Amino acid sequence: MTERFQQKNISVPDGIWIMRQTWNDVLFAHWPVDVSILRALVPSVLELDTYNGQAWISMLPFMLTNLRARYLPVIPGARAFPELNLRTYVTYKGKPGIYFFSLDADHRLAVLGARTFFHLPYFYADMKSEKNGDAIDYVSKRKNDKEAAFHAAYRPISAPFTAEKDSLDYWLTERYRLYTTYRNKLYYEDIHHHPWLLQNAEAEISVNTVTDAHGITLPESDPLLHYAKKQDVLFWPLRKWS
């Protein structure tokens, strides 16, 4: 176990990981949202997690690479494709995690597999991520849903840092479990990675109707922004909560 893991006391989930992938040029765009708005959109079995009483949502555009199952090579055609996640923060029986409203990806097989085997709300979208120096131009338009579109230009503007435990930065980024529901049953999946090496970021989000498509109205204030250059992630099997 590496020094960075030891310093942050991040434990490895039980069992054997089944999938790995790499996230590149990740933008975290965070907005405070009224608890009452999110409560109506999140399954009642989950408790909304708040930081000093405030609920948050986050959008994460990034480029996904090296998607593969354990012991197998990279999935054909999945060497690199964009993904865009919309999420909020929840707990279940004291265990913090995230809940996804949507995950857009520009890879039909990945979308089908995630919907079928992980019961996650993936959508197929036309997407493009272009990098020029340290600046990224990112465009997404969901297929068959013209209202779910996103366009942002972003770049890092600080030296890398790891978030201090108990800080808002840490609370928003260091999450190692996702929750989802299927046929009125609660499921969870654990992930594992190094602590995020973050940078402050600037972004111009010129189009964002993804939140509108899910009934979430964003505040007029600017989002809190972070950037991460790269993160290797391991995934454990989806489990039903007994």
From Swiss-Prot:
InterPro entries named in the record: ADC_dom_sf, DUF2071
Domain of life: Bacteria
SUPFAM superfamilies assigned: Acetoacetate decarboxylase-like (SSF160104)
A Pfam family recorded for this sequence: DUF2071
S-S bonds: none
Name of protein: Uncharacterized protein YqjF
Organism from which the protein derives: Bacillus subtilis (strain 168)
